[in-house]
């Protein structure tokens, strides 16, 4: 049974919305950082503490 793509997309959107609502600075990248982020092969690259990361909290299980 292969994972369905729409389900993964919905999960990603929920995670992104969660970060926006919780007020974390996950998406606060400068334009220069955004260029660096695109070099990584990430599904959801973003910045956290001025560092480029994959997912920003999603892979860590949302535990802060």
UniProtKB/Swiss-Prot annotation:
How would you describe the post-translational modification of this protein?
Contains 4 disulfide bonds.
| Tissues expressed in | Expressed by the venom gland.
According to the record, the signal peptide region is 1-23
- GO MF, one annotated term: toxin activity
Record keywords: Disulfide bond, Secreted, Signal, Toxin
- Main localization of the protein? secreted
One cellular component term from this protein's GO annotations in UniProt: extracellular region
As for subcellular location, the record says: Secreted
Tell me which family the UniProt entry assigns to this protein.
Answer: Belongs to the scoloptoxin-14 family.
Q: What is this protein called?
A: U-scoloptoxin(14)-Er1a
Species, as recorded: Ethmostigmus rubripes (Giant centipede)
């Amino acid at each position: 049974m292969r994972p369905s793509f729409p389900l993964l997309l919905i999960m990603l959107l929920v995670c992104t919305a969660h970060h926006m609502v919780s007020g974390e600075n996950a998406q606060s990248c400068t334009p220069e950082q955004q260029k660096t982020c695109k070099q990584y092969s990430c599904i959801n690259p973003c910045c956290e503490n001025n560092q480029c990361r994959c997912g920003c909290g999603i892979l860590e299980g949302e535990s802060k």
